[in-house]
Amino acid sequence: DKFSGKDAIVDDFPLLEQTQIIVKVEVDADQAVMMNFIHNDSYGLKPKHLMVSELKWKYLIRSAMRGKNIMMTGPAGCGKTMAAKSVVAALERPDYYFNLGATQDPRATLIGNTHFNKEDGTYFSEALFVKAIQTPNAVILLDELSRAHPDAANILMTVLDEGQRYLRLDEADGSPTIKVAEGVTFIATANIG
């Protein structure tokens, strides 16, 4: 499990409430920054707020700002994805979202596909994930990690390992590798129970 040790683990988010609340989080005393975090539901419903303790929320934000990998675990429907999306939006950094639970072909989603047409012949088209890991200071949300195809774990192993941080485009010796850019943070969600 690459989301352990030095990385932040925040679990058991309570259910969401149907009211709008703005949470103010003081980042670091030396930065003297106050940040407002609010989640606006993409379905046009009444804004919702995550009922997370202020201490857990501060820890989560500070961990993300410091570039630590974060894994949020809890039962289905408790607000992990919404909390992760709120963190991503609040950081105001380039962001990418990948629903690994809905991915049937992890190689296509995380690496890319080989295509053929009469004009160009055979060519390789990189996946958006390749662009994401090459984007400095990006925040990459890996949703539903616990439901991911087993091949996704093999592909992500070197990407998430602090000592490696690269993506191999092919299994063959000498195949190209893509280094993860500086400052890239991964936030993952996984169901338990």
Pin down the residues of each PLM region.
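AAA+ P-loop NTPase catalytic core and its hallmark functional loops
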Residues: 2-193
